[in-house]
């Protein structure tokens, strides 16, 4: 009886694992001697330019995943332009035109999606901002001290740009980011080849910021958070305590 229960449990576990598993693929939509385009999701593309023809498959500090779920897309590569279309956007690149520029690459929304048109060099206007290195000396948004290197006394806190924007799209340039060396015993960081290559990520999400974060984790990896109860009770204040306190 016990053996049957154990066998049934193992079979059930295997079924659950197979149901939860998802086929992952490289999703390379197009590649030639110098450019490679990967469809990470219907709203996220990876765009690579390699002048020496050597594309990067190593993990980077930004992108730790190189395999992705299946995505529906259409590829047109006849003629002078390469065109990749998903349910959210359309990318066009002029064949054999070299490094990505505003003259040979454009990404725009498809009909019915949140409207945008992006070319290399276009800047966001509605970034929702991120975080800052330190709040030392800050009273609300104003710096009150003179010894903090990041801000001067009286200056307002200037948050760094974050991932999301009201523009409905985000652009990430990982061309200079460090790579992992794929050592099976002890992975370590290594520099990218200084060959003038480009390694970009473009995300189109409209105002669906939750979906944008989900798409980001497809290539950047999930960010596990420890449970709140593990931290116990924390309380502190910035200014010094007096001996009476």
Where do the protein language model's features map onto the residues?
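Bacterial Sec-dependent N-terminal signal peptides
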Residues: 1-24
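Short N-terminal segments immediately surrounding and downstream of signal-peptide cleavage
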Residues: 23-36
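Short solvent-exposed loop/turn micro-motifs enriched in small/polar/acidic residues
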Residues: 30-31, 68, 75-77, 154-156
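Short, well-ordered beta-strand segments enriched in hydrophobic/aromatic residues
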Residues: 37, 45-49, 83-91
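A low-complexity, Ser/Thr/Gly/Pro-enriched, surface-exposed linker/loop concept
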Residues: 40-79
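Catalytic and substrate-binding clefts that recognize carbohydrates or anionic sugar/phosphate headgroups
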Residues: 77-227, 236-238
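Hydrophobic faces of well-ordered beta-strands that scaffold small-molecule active sites
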Residues: 231-233
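Short, acidic/polar
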Residues: 241-245
């Amino acid at each position: 009886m016990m053996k049957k229960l154990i066998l049934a449990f193992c079979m059930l576990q295997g079924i659950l694992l197979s149901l939860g598993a998802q086929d992952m693929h490289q999703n390379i939509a197009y590649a030639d001697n110098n450019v490679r385009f990967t469809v990470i999701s219907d709203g996220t593309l990876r765009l690579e330019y390699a002048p020496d023809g050597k594309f990067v498959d190593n993990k980077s500090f930004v992108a730790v995943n190189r395999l992705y779920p299946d995505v529906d897309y259409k590829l047109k590569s006849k003629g002078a332009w390469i065109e990749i279309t998903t349910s959210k956007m359309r990318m066009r690149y002029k064949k054999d035109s070299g490094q990505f520029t505003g003259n040979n690459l454009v990404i725009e929304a498809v009909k019915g999606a949140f409207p945008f048109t992006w070319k290399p060099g276009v800047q966001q206007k509605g970034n929702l901002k991120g975080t800052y290195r330190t709040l030392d000396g800050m009273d609300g948004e104003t710096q009150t001290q003179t010894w903090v290197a990041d801000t001067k006394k009286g200056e307002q806190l200037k948050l760094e740009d974050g991932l999301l924007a009201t523009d409905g799209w985000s652009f990430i340039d990982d061309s200079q980011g460090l790579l992992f060396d794929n050592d099976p015993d002890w992975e370590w960081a290594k520099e990218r080849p200084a060959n003038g290559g480009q390694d970009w990520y473009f995300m189109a999400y409209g105002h669906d910021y939750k979906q944008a974060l989900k798409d980001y984790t497809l290539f950047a990896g999930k960010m596990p958070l420890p449970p709140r109860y593990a931290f116990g009770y924390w309380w502190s204040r910035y200014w010094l305590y007096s001996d009476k306190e």
